[in-house]
């Protein structure tokens, strides 16, 4: 069993800090390490300046470890609370419903992991072998990896700065033994944080298919999605498309639809038309989605006749078409 206990890091750090890095630390692998404005007066300045620069020697190892994964997809959102992890969960269930597909779900939200709970395997732990870390299998063809499996209990908090989170992300990408997968879904934190920069850097040589972006219809969510799209374009990440979650509520009794989050500026579809990206579809609200995520059950199996189930399957067909897997 691999575990983080008492808030300690299980991995040897990439470097030894004299004190926690400052808020705007450029990172030890940056060309500006030890030279940036935030480095002045930092006790770690000399340590960072002395570190080797240039290509990360672990990138070829990450590429080799992920070589047997056919499709690698990042799941992104500009704002928290739009249902990104929920959608990742439903996407995992839907793809793995095809017994001919091998699916993996990697939870890289280090400080707020939720996939283990939503997939019904929160009490599991990671085991090591001579081939690396063995992922937790939800079903015979659905595997998952998360920091939650390394914590002593579900209430344990991860209070890490960037370097520790980045080291674990690299460990997940380099040392988890996925074997062969048709799909690896990578659930990321909301926003454009340190983790996103690291994920992009670590996967540069691994030929990811791109990113699926999740939003809700209201402008306050779309404002942050614009930033996410801008980040992807600057980072060279292919945008596979956008999904509008919680687009409406269909009453299970009268079948009438209500707009809970109103698309005051046209919603996700209008944004896609404006910015020239593919709109993969809208998924309506269904309270039973939350119930299934609480119990770790597949919403698509439990409620196949729900309008949300139909919409999710249509989105997945569009996604498979976008990655050339039809």
Curated annotation (Swiss-Prot):
Binding site for ATP: 78-85
Cofactor annotation: [4Fe-4S] cluster
Positions contributing to [4Fe-4S] cluster 2 binding: 251, 254
Cellular localization per UniProt: Cytoplasm; Nucleus
Keyword Secreted (UniProt): no
UniProt region (Disordered), positions on chain: 1-38
Cysteines engaged in disulfide bonds, as pairs: none
Residues that coordinate or bind [4Fe-4S] cluster 1: 25, 39, 42, 48
GO cellular component, one term: cytosol
PROSITE patterns: MRP
Chief site of localization: cytoplasm
GO molecular function per UniProt: 4 iron, 4 sulfur cluster binding; ATP binding; ATP-dependent FeS chaperone activity; metal ion binding
InterPro entries noted in UniProt: Mrp-like_CS (IPR000808), Mrp/NBP35_ATP-bd (IPR019591), NUBP1/Nbp35 (IPR028601), P-loop_NTPase (IPR027417), YlxH/NBP35 (IPR033756)
Ranges of biased composition (kind: Basic and acidic residues): 16-26
GO biological process terms on file: iron-sulfur cluster assembly
Cofactor remark from the record: Binds 4 [4Fe-4S] clusters per heterotetramer. Contains two stable clusters in the N-termini of NBP35 and two labile, bridging clusters between subunits of the NBP35-CFD1 heterotetramer.
A Pfam family per the record: ParA
UniProtKB keywords: 4Fe-4S, ATP-binding, Cytoplasm, Iron, Iron-sulfur, Metal-binding, Nucleotide-binding, Nucleus
Family per record: Belongs to the Mrp/NBP35 ATP-binding proteins family. NUBP1/NBP35 subfamily.
PANTHER family, alphabetized: CYTOSOLIC FE-S CLUSTER ASSEMBLY FACTOR NUBP1, NUCLEOTIDE-BINDING PROTEIN NBP35 YEAST -RELATED
Description of how the protein assembles with itself and partners: Heterotetramer of 2 NBP35 and 2 CFD1 chains.
Known function: Component of the cytosolic iron-sulfur (Fe/S) protein assembly (CIA) machinery. Required for maturation of extramitochondrial Fe-S proteins. The NBP35-CFD1 heterotetramer forms a Fe-S scaffold complex, mediating the de novo assembly of an Fe-S cluster and its transfer to target apoproteins. Required for biogenesis and export of both ribosomal subunits, which may reflect a role in assembly of the Fe/S clusters in RLI1, a protein which performs rRNA processing and ribosome export.
Name of the protein: Cytosolic Fe-S cluster assembly factor NBP35
Source organism per UniProt: Kluyveromyces lactis (strain ATCC 8585 / CBS 2359 / DSM 70799 / NBRC 1267 / NRRL Y-1140 / WM37) (Yeast)
Source species taxonomy: Eukaryota, Fungi, Dikarya, Ascomycota, Saccharomycotina
């Amino acid at each position: 069993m691999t575990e983080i206990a008492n808030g300690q890091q299980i991995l040897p750090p990439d470097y030894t800090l004299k004190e926690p890095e400052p808020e705007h630390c450029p990172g030890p692998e940056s060309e500006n390490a030890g030279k940036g404005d935030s480095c002045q007066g930092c006790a770690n300045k000399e340590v960072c300046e002395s570190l080797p620069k240039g290509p990360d020697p672990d990138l070829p190892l990450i590429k080799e470890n992920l070589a047997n994964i056919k499709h690698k997809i990042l799941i992104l959102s500009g704002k928290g609370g739009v249902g990104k992890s929920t959608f990742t969960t439903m996407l995992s269930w839907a793809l793995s419903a095809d017994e001919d597909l091998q699916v993996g779900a990697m939870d890289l939200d280090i400080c707020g992991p939720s996939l283990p709970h939503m997939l019904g395997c929160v009490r599991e732990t990671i085991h090591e072998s001579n081939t690396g870390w063995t992922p937790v299998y939800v079903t015979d063809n659905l595997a998952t990896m998360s920091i939650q499996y390394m914590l002593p209990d579900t209430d344990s908090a991860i209070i890490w700065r960037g370097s520790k989170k980045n080291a674990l992300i690299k460990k997940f990408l380099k040392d988890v033994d996925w074997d062969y997968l048709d799909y690896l879904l990578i659930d990321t934190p909301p926003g454009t944080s340190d983790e996103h920069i690291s994920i992009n850097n670590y996967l540069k040589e691994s030929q990811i298919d791109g990113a699926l972006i999740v939003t809700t219809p209201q402008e306050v969510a779309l404002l942050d999605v614009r930033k996410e799209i801008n980040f992807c374009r600057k980072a060279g990440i292919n945008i596979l498309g956008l999904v509008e979650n919680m687009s409406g509520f269909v009453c299970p009794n009268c079948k009438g639809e209500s707009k809970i989050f109103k698309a005051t500026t046209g919603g996700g579809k209008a944004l896609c038309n404006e910015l020239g990206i593919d709109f993969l579809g809208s998924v309506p609200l269904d309270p039973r989605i939350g119930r299934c995520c609480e119990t770790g059950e597949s919403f698509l199996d439990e409620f196949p006749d729900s309008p949300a189930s139909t919409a999710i399957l249509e989105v997945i067909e569009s996604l498979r078409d976008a990655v050339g897997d039809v």
